[in-house]
């Protein structure tokens, strides 16, 4: 553990719609801390509603950082997020205050506590080669190439995961080593594992499913259609992460009059529930036993479970 890792941080993980943001605000008020986005989709601009970013009222209640600061035309990696967090934690005006990391991206939490893998530089020539092939041949074809050249990492990737497939091929060609080998070489952690309060929300599945349905209906009523219309006006590459946000494809189909309002909402709700299930499974299998599990944010404050790190 790095000596300059931040001590007494609060980490709040959990599936989408589980109440993480409300809990983070309550903790920020209790500690005088500040909230740091730990969700890979909430970094992108334009999609305030569809990515469930904090509302204006939320922002007025506590300081929030790293939300909506990336244009949807960009690709934002775990490494870039790590760099942004490192810079944020070094700001003088935030020294001595409790950082509260909240979100649903497990790899971000892993990087915070365990350090980031030291990734090699890839030449522009190699990068252009593989990205050109991806555009020409598609993810499935390049996944087949990866199966032959690096079967171990190919087995860990979905055949549709174009971004990670290209990255694995780039690294293999540039270094002669599998991306899996590079991922074993860790840098310094940003947060001290021992002193951090680590919380994971695991609400009742039926309750979460209903909450997801209500929330998406509210998103639709509050302007999700306008968000997607604004995103489509940018004429972005469909392969960009922001274009893959849940709800974008469904609302786009509604705008193109190829899907009814009811079907667009229903499909978005189903996709969100499936995503929440994948998140819950990841947190259950990947987080250590020192993460405390709660059914709700309210439960965290009951019975003296929460301790003010100040």
Curated annotation (Swiss-Prot):
Give coiled-coil spans as residue ranges: none
Q: Which GO terms describe its biological process?
A: tRNA modification
Recorded E.C. number(s)?
2.5.1.75
Which coenzyme or cofactor does it need?
A: Mg(2+)
Gene3D superfamilies listed in its UniProt record = 1.10.20.140, P-loop containing nucleotide triphosphate hydrolases (3.40.50.300)
Give the signal sequence positions: none
Q: Where is this site: Interaction with substrate tRNA?
A: 105, 127
Q: Which InterPro entries match?
A: Dimethylallyltransferase, IPT, P-loop_NTPase
Keywords attached to this entry: ATP-binding, Magnesium, Nucleotide-binding, Transferase, tRNA processing
Catalytic activity, reaction form: adenosine(37) in tRNA + dimethylallyl diphosphate = N(6)-dimethylallyladenosine(37) in tRNA + diphosphate
- Broad class of enzyme this protein falls into: transferase
Record GO terms (molecular function): ATP binding; tRNA dimethylallyltransferase activity
Binding residue positions for ATP: 14-21
Q: Does the keyword tRNA processing apply?
A: yes
Where on this chain does substrate bind?
16-21
Which cysteines in this chain are paired by disulphide bridges?
none
Q: Where is this region: Interaction with substrate tRNA?
A: 39-42, 163-167
Q: How does it assemble?
A: Monomer.
**Role summary:** Catalyzes the transfer of a dimethylallyl group onto the adenine at position 37 in tRNAs that read codons beginning with uridine, leading to the formation of N6-(dimethylallyl)adenosine (i(6)A).
Q: What is this protein called?
A: tRNA dimethylallyltransferase
């Amino acid at each position: 553990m790095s000596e300059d890792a931040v001590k007494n941080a609060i980490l709040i993980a959990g599936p989408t719609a589980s109440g993480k943001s409300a809990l983070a605000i309550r903790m920020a008020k209790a500690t005088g801390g500040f909230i740091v986005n730990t969700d890979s989709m909430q970094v992108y601009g334009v999609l305030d509603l569809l990515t469930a970013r904090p509302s204006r009222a939320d922002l007025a209640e506590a300081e929030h950082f790293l939300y909506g600061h990336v244009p949807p035309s960009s690709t934002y990696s775990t490494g870039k997020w790590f760099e942004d967090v490192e810079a944020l934690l070094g700001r003088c005006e935030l020294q001595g205050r409790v950082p509260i990391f909240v979100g649903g991206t497990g790899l971000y939490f892993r990087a915070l506590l365990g350090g980031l893998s030291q990734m090699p530089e890839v030449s522009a020539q190699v990068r252009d080669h593989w990205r050109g092939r991806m555009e020409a041949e598609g993810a499935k074809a390049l996944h087949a190439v990866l199966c032959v050249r690096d079967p171990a990492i190919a087995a860990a990737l979905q055949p549709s995961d174009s971004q990670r497939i290209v990255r694995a091929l780039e690294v293999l060609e540039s270094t002669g080593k599998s991306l899996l080998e590079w991922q074993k070489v860790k840098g310094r952690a940003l947060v001290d594992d021992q002193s951090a309060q680590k919380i994971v929300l695991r609400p009742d599945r039926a309750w979460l499913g209903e909450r997801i349905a209500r929330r998406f209906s509210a998103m639709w009523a509050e302007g999700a259609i306008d968000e997607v219309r604004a995103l489509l006006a940018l004429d972005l590459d469909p392969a960009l992460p922001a274009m893959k946000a849940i709800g974008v494809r469904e609302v786009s189909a509604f705008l193109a009059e190829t899907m009814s309002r009811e079907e667009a909402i229903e499909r978005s709700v189903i996709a969100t529930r499936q995503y929440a299930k994948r998140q819950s499974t990841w947190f259950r299998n990947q987080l250590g036993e020192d993460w405390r599990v709660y059914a709700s944010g309210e439960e965290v404050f009951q019975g003296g479970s929460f301790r003010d790190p100040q």
